[in-house]
Amino acid sequence: MKSKTKTRRKAREYAVQALYSWQISKNDIYDVINHFKKNKTINEIDQIYFYELIIGITKNLKYLDELMRPYLSRTIQELGQIEKAILRISFFELDKRYDIPFKVTINESIELAKLFGAKDSHKFINGVLDKASLKLRKNNSNKN
C-alpha cells in the first residue's frame, strides 16, 4: 500500500494536469474528470483529495483568483496555464485545508512547478506563496 504522502502528491500532479486541460479546453469539469478516470491510473492517487481539489477549485474559482491577486506581480490572465493551475491548488490548500501545514503546500507547489512549469516558474511560485502564506495563515491562525 502506498503512503498517504505519495498518493496525495500524485493527486496534486493529476490535479495540475486536469486543471490545465480544463483551463485550455473550457470543457465541463466533469468531462475532464471522466477523461482522467479513463486514461490515468487513478487508483494510485488519493482520489478523494483529487476530487476535492478539482471540484473545490472550479466552484471557488473567482474567489481563489481574487485571493491570489494581491500577491502576483502580473495579472492572472498573464500567468502561464501551468502556473495558474498550481497557484489555484496552492491557494485552495492555504485557504481551505488548515490540516495541511503551509510549508507542505509551498514545498509541494515548488515541486509541481519544477515538474510541469517553465524553467524558473518554481521561483515565481515560491515567491508568491511565501508572501501569501504568511498573510493568509496569520489572518486565520485560529484555524491552524
UniProtKB/Swiss-Prot annotation:
Instruction: Name the Gene Ontology biological process terms.
Output: DNA-templated transcription termination; transcription antitermination
Q: GO cellular-component terms in the record?
A: cytosol
Q: Which Pfam families does the entry mention?
A: NusB
The record's Gene3D superfamilies line, in alphabetical order, gives:
NusB-like
Question: Does the keyword RNA-binding belong to this entry?
Answer: yes
Question: Which GO molecular-function terms appear in the entry?
Answer: RNA binding
**What UniProt keywords apply to this chain's record, in alphabetical order?**
RNA-binding, Transcription, Transcription antitermination, Transcription regulation
Q: Family membership, please give it.
A: Belongs to the NusB family.
Q: What does this protein do?
A: Involved in transcription antitermination. Required for transcription of ribosomal RNA (rRNA) genes. Binds specifically to the boxA antiterminator sequence of the ribosomal RNA (rrn) operons.
Instruction: Please state what the protein is called.
Output: Transcription antitermination protein NusB
Q: What is the lineage of its organism?
A: Bacteria, Pseudomonadati, Pseudomonadota, Gammaproteobacteria, Enterobacterales
